[in-house]
Curated annotation (Swiss-Prot):
PANTHER family: LAMININ SUBUNIT GAMMA-1, NETRIN/LAMININ-RELATED. It comes from the Eukaryota. The keyword Disulfide bond applies. Residues 1013-1592 are annotated as: Domain II and I. Residues 1018-1477, 1515-1579 form a coiled coil. Residues 1-19 form the signal peptide. This is Laminin subunit gamma-1. The lineage of its organism: Eukaryota, Metazoa, Chordata, Craniata, Vertebrata. It comes from Xenopus tropicalis. Residues 1476-1489 have a biased composition (Polar residues).
Length: 1592
C-alpha cells in the first residue's frame, strides 16, 4: 500500500524541483533562494536504544478516562503484524492503519532513571522549524529533545518537557526567553506532560517560538546556528502513570511503556540562501545544488575562481553571491586574500598568471621579464646569470652588469678582465668543517677529512651527511638500518639533553659489581650526588636508569658528560671505566681517554663522545654501523664508581646530548634517508607497500622483498607477508579461490576465480570428468545440484514453480515436533503436520482442546497438559479449560484450577449445582468453616445446631466462648433449663440463681418437702425489715441525690432534709426501744436470733471474702474491658489504615463513578460499630464501678448494723439480699463483658473480613508494612555499613593522598630545580645574545669605517667617476647582495630537486591511475590514494612555483644591486678588505637560512667565508669563485622550470580526469550494491499471513 503513495510523492517532489530550478535568479539577477519545506524525518533512519519484541513480550493498553480498563497484546519483533520497530516512527502516517514504535514495558525496568534514546540521522544540516511527536500511548512525564549541528558533534539540549522541570532537569518551568538572555538555551515546560489523552497526544516544538530575535532571524547568527541540526535525538526519561505502579502488579506494569506513532521534523535543507534544492551527490550524500557561484554541502564556500569578496549567507536584502576574481584575462585561478580585501575592497588574488605576468591581478611582469606596453606579453630578460648583477632588466631588455663585464646581456668580459665568474678570483675557499689544511697553492684544491669531498671540501661523500667541524671524520655515515647510503639532515629536530642532577634522590640510578650483582647505592643530599664504597679492589659501577637507555640513536656523535670525584686519590684505572652495552655489543673506554683527567678529591667534569673513531678509543673497535646499531638499542651505561679499596666514589650531574622533535636549536646530526625501492620511513625502517620482511625476526634490519601474491595483489602485510588478496582469491599468497568462487588462482589473471552459480554465494566444486559445477555447501534448508530444492524441515519455492519464487525457510513448529522425524511440515506451505506434546495449530503453537499450558515453553513438562476438570464443580457442557492458565469454568462458589474444591465457607460440591454457603454463626462457631460434605459447623462448647446458632439443652449465655451449663438445683428448680441470664425457675419458697436457697421467712426442712414458711410471728419481723429497707432506700436515694447533685439544693432544703433524716433516726431509735418492751417469748426469740446472729457473723466473714472475690472479679472485668478497648482500638487503627488505603486508591467501579464503593461503606460501618461497642464497654465499666460502690456501701452498712447491736436479723437478710444483688450484678457485668468482648471480636472479624475484601486493591497490611519497615531497617543497616566502609576508604584515600601530596611536593621541588636549570639556560642564551649583538655592533662599526675609506677611493676612469655615488651606495649593500646570491642559488637547487621529485611523483601517480583503471571493481581505495597523491603533488607544484617566484624576485634585486657596483671592479686593498668584512655578515645570515640542497649553498657559504679571511684580493681566486657562481646560475637557467611546470600541470590534469572517471564508476557500483541491498531488505522476513492464535 505504501509503494503507490511513495510513487505519488516522488512525482510531486520532481515537479517541485523542476519548478524551483530558477528560484535563485530573477531575470538573470541573483536572489535569495531556499529548498522547499519538507518533513526531513520522512523515511529517515531512527536508532532506538530500546524496542519491544525481543524476546516476545506482553503489553496492556489502557482505555477509559482513567485507564482502568486494560486489554493485553503481544509485541514480537519476529512477526510482522506484532512488531513495533523504530522504522515505524518515520514511515507514512496512515491514520487508517497506524504503525508505531514501542519500548519494553515498566515490567522490564523501563522507568526513570533509565532512559531511552531515539536518534534521527538527517544525513545533512537542516534549518529546523519544528519537531513533532505523536504518541500512541500517553505522553511521558519527562522527556527531552537534543540536536547536533554537525556529524560526530556534541549533543546540544533543544527542549525539555516535564511535569517536574526543576527536579528532573534542574530547569525552571517557563516557555519563553527574555530579551538579553542566551537565546541558544533550552527551555523546560510542563505543557505536554499530562497523562491524558491516553493515546494520540501530540507534542510540537517550534525552534523559534519564545525567542526575541526570531523576528530578525536574518541578522541573528545565534538563531541561525540554533535552528541548524544534522541529527535529532529524543530522550525519554520518565513515564506518566496513575500511581498504581507502586504496588508492582505485573498487569499494571505491563500497561506502562513508551509508544510513538509519528516522528516529524519540519524544515528546509540548509543551503544558506544559495540553493533552491538539495540533491544526492556521487556518494549518495545529500548536498545543496548550489547557485550564486558557491559550493559545499551547505553552499558554505565560494567556487575557486569566485573569491573577490568573502562568502556570506544570502539574505532577503542581499543575495551575497560570490564574485569572480579580476585577473585581466590572464588566469582562471585565485584565492581570497583578506589583507588585499581590507586595503582595496577586492580580495581576489590571482595565481598561475599567463604571459609571464604576476601580481594580485596579473597586472605586472614576473621577475626577470619585461614589456614595453601593458597589453603585450612579457618577454624574458635573458641576462647572463654569471656576468649580471641581477637577472632583471629594464623596460627595454637591458641588463645591469657586474664590474668588468659588458654587453647588453652582460655575457662577456671587459678588456683587462678574465675568467668570468660570480665574484672573480677569490681566496682559497676551503670549508673548515670539511678540510684539514689549506688548499694547494697551485691548484686551489683543499685537503679534506675522511668522509668529505669537493674542491673546497664543501660536501660529504656519498653515504655520509652533516658536515660538522667538530667531527674528526667531517661527516656522519648514513645509518638507515643498512638499507640506504643516501641521507641528509632531517628538519624539525632540536637539541635536547637527558639529565640526572640527583637533587631529590638517586633518580633511578643503581649500582652493580662487575659480575652484575646488585650493590648498595647512597644518595648524598648535601652535594646532590650518589656514591658507592667498594669493600675490595673489584670495581663498582653506577648503572644508568631507563631514560638513558633504549633508542639513543640521536646521541650518535654527541657527548656523554658527568661530574665525578673520589674520596681518596688512590686510583687504579682500567680499560673498562665507562661501558656501553646494546644490540649484542659491548664497548668500553678508560676514564682518562678523550682528554679527560685522572679522578681526584675535587669534582671534575668528564666528557665522552659517542663515536667509534680511533680518536675516541672505544674497545673493541667497531664499525660506524655497529656503533649506531648499539645506540639504537642501548641496554646499559656503566660508569665506574670505585677505584680503590674502601674509597668512595661520588657521581654528580650526568647529561647525554640527544635530539627530539620540536622547535628550538636545530640538531642537524639526525638523518633522513632517501630509501631505495621497497623501503619507506625516515630511516628506511619500514617496508613499502608491496614488500615484506625477508626475515621478520631481524626487525627493521631485515631486507624487504616483493610480496608473493600470484598476481592478485600489489600489497601484503609487511611483517607476515600475507597478501591483501583481490580478484576473489584467498590464502597467504592468494593461492586459492575465495569461498563462493572456483577456478585456478595461480594463473595470475583477474578472471582466475569465477563466482559459484549457487544461491547466497555458497561454495562449489568442478567435477573433473564432466566439468560440471556442483554446489557443495547449499544454504541451510536447500538441496540439489544448484540448491534448487527445499530440504526436509524447510518450506518454500526457490525456483517459483508454484508462483513467485520464495526462499526456503525453516518450518516454524514452535519446537513441538520430533526433530528426528521426517515430514514434520509441508515443504510448500510450511504447515506443521506432526505436532507433539499435545499441541496443534498451523505452527504447533497452541494446545489441543482439553489441554492447557505454554506450548512455546522449552521444557516439555511445562507444555500442554490435560485440563482434568472436576465434573461436579465444572459448568455442564464445558470439557475444556483456559489454554494458558488451565482454569476450568467453575460453578458458583467452586474454586481451584480444576474446580475440585469449595470456596472457604461453602460446602456440598457433589450437588452438581455449585457449593452452598455454610452460614455458620459468627459467635457460635469456632470458625467460618464447615464440613465440606454435611455442612456442619464447628461449634464452641455448649453450642449446638448445624450453624452453631443455639445453646445445648440446660445451657445458657450464648457467646464467643460457648454456652455455660445452667446447673439448676433439681430440688428447688421447676426445670433444669434456665433463662438466658442463667437464672433458674424456682419452686415456691426457693430463691437464688440456681434455686438452691430458701426465700426470706422460709427455712429448709431436711425432713420435709424443701423450704417451708416460718411461723406467722416472723411476718412481723419481715414487715419491719421491709419498712427499714424502705427507709434505707430513701436514705440511699438522698445520698445518691447529694452525690450526683442532680437537684439544686439550697441550704434551707438541705437542713429540712437533715431534720427529716434526724426524725427518721429518732423514730428508728424509738422503735428499737419499744422492742425492749416485748414479752419474754420475744426475748427468748431474740436469744435464738442472737444465736442465729453468731451464725450470720460467720457468714458475714464469708460475705467479706466473697466481696473481695467480687472486687477481684470486678477488676478482672475492668481488665477485660480495657482489653476489649485495646482490641477495639486496634480494630479502629486497622480500619483507619484500610480506609486510608481505600481513599488513596480511589477505585471507581465500572457501573458507578459517583458513589463511594462498598468497601468504604463497610469500613465506615465497622468503624461506627466499633465505636458503639467501645461506648458500651465504657458504660459497662461504669456499671461495674457502681456495683463495686454498692458492695462497699453494703459492707459499711453491715458493719454499722453490727456495731449498734440493735440491728435485727432482717438487716442481715437485707445485706444478704444486697450481696446477692451485687453478685448478680457482677455476674451480669461478666456476662456483658463477655458479650462486649464477643461483639468486639465480631467487629474485629468483620474488619478483617472487610480488609480481606480489599484484595482487588493493593495489599496494605501491617505485616507488609512491618516487612517493609524491616527491609528499610536492613537497608539502613547496610547503608550504615556502607558509610563505615566509605569512611574507611576515605581514611585510606586520605593516607594515599598524603603520599601523593609528598610526591607532588617532590615533583614541585624538582620542577623548581628544573626551572632554575631553565633560568640558567636562559641566562646563557641571554649572554650569547649579548655577544651576538656586540659582534653585530662591531660589524656595523667596521662597515662604517669601510664606508669612510670608500669615500676616499680614487676614480679609475670617466665611467667610474660618473657612477661613484651609485657604487658607494651599492657597496653598503654588499652583505645583502651576497646573501641574496646564496639564497638564490640555494632555492634554485631546491626548485630543481623538488621539481624533479614532483615530476617523478606525477609519473608514479599516473602509472598507478592507469593500473587502477584495469581494476575498476575494487578501485575505490586506490583511487582515493591516487587522488590524495595528486592533490599533494599539485600542492607541491603550487608551493614550488611560489618559492621559484620569490627566488627570481630575490635574484632580480641582487642583479639590480650588483649593477650599481660595475664601476668599482678595480678597488684597492682597503676596498677589498671592507668588502671582505661585509661578506662575513652575509655568510652568517646565509648559514641561518633553510637549506634543502647542501651542495650549492655550502659552496657559496664557504666561498664567502674564505673571502672574509683574506687580507687582500687575489684575482685568481676570484676567478674560481666566479666560475662556481656561474655554474649555479647555469643550473638555474637550464632547469627549464616553465616547461616542467607545464608538464606537471598537464599530468595532474590527466590524472584528475582519470580519477573523476574512476569515481563515477565507483559511484555506479556503490549504487548498484545499494539497490541490491534495498531489494534484499524489501524481501519478507517471515510469513505475513500468520493467523492470530489468541485474540487480545
Amino acid at each position: 500500500m505504501r509503494a503507490p503513495v511513495l510513487a505519488v510523492l516522488a512525482v510531486l517532489l520532481l515537479g517541485t524541483v523542476r519548478a524551483a530550478m530558477d528560484e535563485c535568479y530573477e531575470e538573470g539577477s541573483p536572489q535569495r533562494c531556499m529548498p522547499e519545506f519538507v518533513n526531513a524525518a520522512f523515511n529517515a533512519t531512527v536508532v532506538a536504544t530500546n524496542t519491544c519484541g525481543t524476546p516476545p513480550e506482553e503489553y496492556c493498553v489502557q482505555t477509559g478516562v482513567t485507564g482502568v480498563t486494560k486489554s493485553c497484546h503481544i509485541c514480537d519483533s519476529g512477526q510482522f503484524h506484532l512488531q513495533h520497530g523504530a522504522e515505524y516512527l518515520t514511515d507514512y502516517n496512515n491514520q487508517a492503519e497506524i504503525t508505531w514504535w514501542q519500548s519494553q514495558t515498566m515490567l522490564a525496568g523501563i522507568q526513570y532513571p533509565s532512559t531511552i534514546n531515539l536518534t534521527l540521522h538527517l544525513g545533512k544540516a537542516f534549518d529546523i522549524t519544528y519537531v513533532r511527536l505523536k504518541f500512541h500511548t500517553s505522553r511521558p512525564e519527562s522527556f527531552a529533545l537534543y540536536k547536533r549541528t554537525h556529524e560526530d558533534g556534541p549533543w546540544i539540549p533543544y527542549q525539555y518537557y516535564s511535569g517536574s522541570c526543576e527536579k528532573t532537569y534542574q530547569k525552571f518551568n517557563r516557555g519563553f526567553i527574555r530579551t538579553g538572555e542566551d537565546e541558544q538555551q533550552a527551555l523546560c515546560t510542563d505543557e505536554f506532560s499530562d497523562i491524558s489523552p491516553l493515546t494520540g497526544g501530540n507534542v510540537a516544538f517550534s525552534t523559534l517560538e519564545g525567542r526575541p530575535s526570531a523576528y530578525n532571524f536574518d541578522n541573528s547568527p545565534v538563531l541561525q546556528e540554533w535552528v541548524t541540526a544534522t541529527d535529532i535525538r529524543v530522550t525519554l526519561n520518565r513515564l506518566n502513570t496513575f500511581g498504581d505502579e507502586v504496588f508492582s502488579d505485573p498487569k499494571v506494569l505491563k500497561s506502562y511503556y513508551y509508544a510513538i506513532s509519528d516522528f516529524a521534523v519540519g524544515g528546509r535543507c540548509k543551503c544558506n540562501g544559495h540553493a533552491s534544492e538539495c540533491v544526492r551527490n556521487e556518494f549518495e550524500k545529500i548536498v545543496c545544488n548550489c547557485k550564486h557561484n558557491t559550493f559545499g554541502s551547505d553552499c558554505e564556500k565560494c567556487l575557486p575562481f569566485y573569491n573577490d569578496r568573502p562568502w556570506r549567507r544570502s539574505t532577503a536584502d542581499s543575495p551575497n553571491e560570490c564574485l569572480p576574481c579580476n585577473c585581466n584575462g590572464r588566469s582562471q585561478e585565485c584565492y581570497f586574500d583578506p589583507e588585499l580585501y581590507r586595503s582595496t575592497g577586492h580580495g581576489g588574488h590571482c595565481t598561475g598568471c599567463a604571459d609571464n605576468t604576476d601580481g594580485p591581478n596579473c597586472e605586472r611582469c614576473r621577475e626577470n621579464y619585461y614589456r614595453q606596453d601593458n597589453n603585450e606579453p612579457c618577454h624574458a630578460c635573458q641576462c647572463n646569470p654569471v656576468g649580471s648583477l641581477s637577472t632583471q632588466c629594464d623596460n627595454y631588455g637591458r641588463c645591469s652588469c657586474k664590474p668588468g663585464v659588458m654587453g647588453e646581456k652582460c655575457d662577456r668580459c671587459q678588456p683587462g678582465f678574465h675568467s668570468l665568474t660570480e665574484a672573480g678570483c677569490r681566496p682559497c675557499a676551503c670549508n673548515p668543517a670539511g678540510s684539514t689544511d689549506e688548499c694547494n697553492v697551485e691548484t686551489g684544491r683543499c685537503s679534506c677529512k675522511d668522509n668529505v669531498e669537493g674542491f673546497n671540501c664543501e660536501r660529504c661523500k656519498p653515504g655520509f651527511f652533516h658536515l660538522d667541524e667538530a667531527n674528526p671524520r667531517g661527516c656522519t655515515p648514513c645509518f638507515c638500518y643498512g638499507h640506504s647510503s643516501v641521507c641528509s639532515s632531517a628538519e624539525g629536530y632540536r637539541v635536547s639533553s637527558i639529565v640526572s642532577t640527583f637533587e631529590s634522590g638517586v633518580e633511578g640510578w643503581t649500582a652493580q659489581q662487575r659480575d652484575g650483582s646488585e650493590y648498595s647505592l647512597s644518595w648524598v643530599s648535601d652535594s646532590s650526588a650518589v656514591s658507592v664504597i667498594s669493600e675490595s679492589y673489584f670495581p663498582i659501577y653506577f648503572i644508568a636508569p631507563a631514560k638513558f637507555l633504549g633508542n639513543q640513536g640521536a646521541s650518535y656523535g654527541q657527548n656523554l658528560t658527568f661530574s665525578f670525584r673520589v674520596e681518596r686519590r688512590d686510583t687504579r684505572l682500567s680499560a673498562e671505566d665507562l661501558v656501553l652495552e646494546g644490540a649484542g655489543l659491548r664497548v668500553s673506554v678508560p676514564l682518562i681517554a678523550q682528554g679527560n683527567s685522572y679522578p681526584s678529591e675535587t669534582t671534575q667534569r668528564y666528557i665522552f663522545r659517542m663515536h667509534e673513531a680511533t680518536d675516541y678509543p672505544w674497545r673493541p673497535s667497531v664499525s660506524p654501523f655497529e656503533f649506531q646499531k648499539m645506540l639504537q638499542n642501548l641496554t646499559a651505561i656503566k660508569i665506574r664508581g670505585s677505584y680503590s679499596e674502601r674509597s668512595a666514589g661520588f657521581l654528580e650531574e650526568v647529561s647525554l646530548v640527544t635530539a627530539v622533535a620540536g622547535a628550538g636549536p636545530s640538531a642537524p646530526w639526525v638523518e633522513i634517508c632517501s630509501c631505495p625501492t621497497g623501503y619507506i620511513g625516515q630511516f628506511c625502517e619500514r617496508c613499502a607497500p608491496g614488500y615484506r620482511r625477508e626475515n621478520p625476526s631481524q626487525g627493521p634490519y631485515s631486507p624487504c622483498v616483493l610480496c608473493t601474491c600470484n598476481g592478485h595483489s600489489d600489497t601484503c602485510d609487511p611483517e607476515s607477508g600475507v597478501c591483501d588478496c583481490q580478484h576473489n582469491t584467498a590464502g597467504p599468497h592468494c593461492e586459492r579461490c575465495s569461498e563462493g568462487y572456483y577456478g585456478d588462482s595461480t594463473t595470475g589473471s583477474a578472471s582466475d576465480c569465477q563466482p559459484c552459480p549457487c544461491p547466497g554465494g555458497s561454495s562449489c566444486a568442478v567435477v573433473p570428468r564432466t566439468k560440471e559445477v556442483v554446489c557443495t555447501n547449499c544454504p541451510l534448508g536447500t538441496t540439489g545440484k544448484r540448491c534448487e530444492l527445499c530440504d526436509d524441515g524447510y518450506f518454500g519455492d526457490p525456483l517459483g514453480e508454484n508462483g513467485a519464487p520464495r526462499p526456503c525457510r525453516i518450518c516454524e513448529c514452535s519446537n513441538n515436533i520430533d526433530p528426528n522425524a521426517v515430514g514434520n511440515c509441508d515443504r510448500l506451505t510450511g504447515e506443521c503436520l506432526k505436532c507433539i506434546y499435545n499441541t496443534g495449530g498451523f505452527y504447533c503453537d497452541r494446545c489441543r482442546d482439553g489441554f492447557y499450558g505454554n506450548p512455546l515453553a522449552q521444557n516439555p513438562d511445562l507444555k500442554c497438559r490435560a485440563c482434568s476438570c472436576n465434573p461436579y464443580g465444572t459448568v455442564k457442557g464445558q470439557s475444556g479449560c483456559n489454554q494458558v492458565t488451565g482454569q476450568c469454568e467453575c460453578l458458583p462458589h467452586v474454586t481451584e484450577r480444576d474446580c475440585s474444591a469449595c470456596e472457604p465457607g461453602f460446602y456440598n460440591l457433589l450437588s452438581g449445582r455449585g457449593c452452598e454457603r455454610c452460614d455458620c454463626h459468627s459467635l457460635g462457631s469456632t470458625s467460618g468453616q464447615c464440613d465440606v460434605r454435611t455442612g456442619q459447623c464447628e461449634c464452641h462448647p455448649g453450642i449446638s445446631g448445624q450453624q452453631c446458632q443455639q445453646c445445648e439443652p440446660n445451657h445458657f449465655g450464648f457467646g464467643p466462648e460457648g454456652c455455660k451449663p445452667c446447673d439448676c438445683d433439681p430440688e428447688g428448680s421447676g426445670s433444669l433449663q434456665c433463662k438466658e441470664d442463667g437464672r433458674c425457675e424456682c419452686k415456691s419458697g426457693f430463691v437464688g440463681t440456681r434455686c438452691d436457697q430458701c426465700e426470706e421467712n422460709y427455712f429448709y426442712n431436711r425432713s420435709g418437702p424443701g423450704c417451708q414458711e416460718c411461723p406467722a410471728c416472723y411476718r412481723l419481723v419481715k414487715d419491719k425489715v421491709n419498712e427499714q429497707r424502705g427507709k434505707l432506700q430513701e436514705l440511699e436515694d438522698l445520698l445518691k441525690n447529694l452525690s450526683t447533685g442532680e437537684e439544686n439544693i439550697t441550704d434551707q432544703a438541705f437542713e429540712e432534709r437533715l431534720r427529716e433524716a434526724e426524725k427518721a433516726v429518732n423514730d428508728l431509735l424509738l422503735d428499737a426501744q419499744s422492742s425492749k418492751d416485748v414479752d419474754q417469748g420475744m426475748l427468748d426469740r431474740l436469744a435464738e436470733i442472737n444465736t442465729t446472729l453468731s451464725f450470720q457473723l460467720e457468714r458475714l466473714q464469708n460475705i467479706r471474702d466473697m466481696i473481695r472475690d467480687t472486687d477481684k472479679q470486678a477488676q478482672e472485668a475492668r481488665d477485660r474491658v480495657e482489653n476489649t478497648e485495646f482490641i477495639i482500638d486496634s480494630a479502629r487503627v486497622q480500619l483507619e489504615k484500610a480506609k486510608m488505603a481505600i481513599a488513596n486508591v480511589s477505585i471507581t467501579p465500572p457501573e458507578s463513578t459517583g458513589d463511594p464503593n462498598n468497601m468504604t461503606l463497610l469500613a465506615e460501618e465497622a468503624r461506627k460499630l466499633a465505636e458503639r461497642h467501645m461506648q458500651e464497654a465504657r458504660d459497662i465499666e461504669k456499671a461495674a464501678k457502681e456495683a463495686n460502690d454498692t458492695a462497699n456501701e453494703a459492707l459499711r452498712l453491715l458493719q454499722k448494723t453490727l456495731a449498734s447491736e440493735n440491728q435485727t436479723a432482717l438487716d442481715i437478710e437485707e445485706l444478704n439480699r444486697k450481696y446477692a444483688q451485687a453478685k448478680d450484678i457482677a455476674r451480669e457485668l461478666e456476662k456483658q463483658a463477655s458479650k462486649v468482648h464477643a461483639e468486639a471480636e465480631e467487629a474485629g472479624n468483620r474488619a478483617l473480613q472487610i480488609y480481606a475484601n480489599l484484595t482487588s486493591v493493593p495489599s496494605i497490611d501491617t505485616t507488609a508494612l512491618q516487612n517493609e519497615a524491616d527491609k528499610i531497617q536492613k537497608e539502613a543497616e547496610e547503608l550504615d555499613s556502607l558509610i563505615d566502609r566509605k569512611l574507611r576508604d576515605y581514611e585510606d584515600l586520605r593516607e594515599d593522598m598524603r603520599g601523593r601530596e609528598m610526591e607532588v611536593k617532590n615533583l614541585l621541588d624538582k620542577g623548581k630545580t628544573e626551572q632554575q636549570t631553565a633560568d640558567q639556560l636562559l641566562a646563557r642564551a641571554d649572554a650569547a645574545k649579548a655577544q651576538a649583538e656586540e659582534a653585530a655592533k662591531k660589524g656595523r662599526e667596521t662597515l662604517q669605517e669601510a664606508n669612510d675609506i670608500l669615500n676616499k677611493l680614487r676614480d679609475f676612469d670617466k665611467r667610474v667617476n660618473d657612477n661613484k655615488t651609485a657604487a658607494e651606495a651599492a657597496l653598503r649593500k654588499i652583505p645583502m647582495i651576497a646573501q641574496t646570491i646564496a639564497e638564490a642559488n640555494n632555492k634554485t637547487r631546491q626548485a630543481e630537486s623538488a621539481l624533479g621529485n614532483a615530476n617523478a611523483d606525477a609519473r608514479g601517480a599516473k602509472s598507478k591511475a592507469e593500473e587502477a583503471e584495469a581494476l575498476a571493481n575494487t578501485v575505490q581505495k586506490k583511487a582515493a590514494t591516487a587522488r590524495a597523491e595528486a592533490d599533494n603533488t599539485f600542492k607541491e607544484v603550487t608551493d614550488l612555483d611560489g618559492e621559484l617566484q620569490d627566488m627570481l624576485q630575490q635574484l632580480q634585486e641582487a642583479e639590480n644591486q650588483l649593477k650599481k657596483k660595475q664601476a668599482e671592479a678595480e678597488s684597492d686593498e682597503k676596498m677589498a678588505e671592507m668588502a671582505s668584512n661585509a661578506t662575513k655578515d652575509a655568510e652568517s645570515n646565509a648559514n641561518n637560512s633553510k637549506k634543502s640542497v647542501n651542495g650549492v649553498l655550502a659552496t657559496i657559504d664557504e666561498l664567502l667565508s674564505r673571502l672574509g679571511q683574506l687580507d687582500s684580493v687575489d684575482v685568481g681566486q676570484l676567478t674560481v669563485l666566479e666560475k662556481t657562481l656561474d655554474d649555479a646560475k647555469n643550473q638555474l637557467r637550464d632547469s627549464d622550470l616553465d616547461r616542467k611546470l607545464a608538464e606537471l600541470q598537464e599530468s595532474s590534469n590527466l590524472q584528475r580526469v582519470a580519477l573523476d572517471s574512476y569515481s563515477r564508476d565507483i559511484d555506479q557500483i556503490l549504487r548498484d550494491i545499494a539497490n541490491l541491498e534495498d531489494i534484499k531488505n524489501t524481501l519478507p522476513a517471515g510469513c505475513y499471513n500468520t493467523p492470530i492464535i489468541e485474540k487480545p
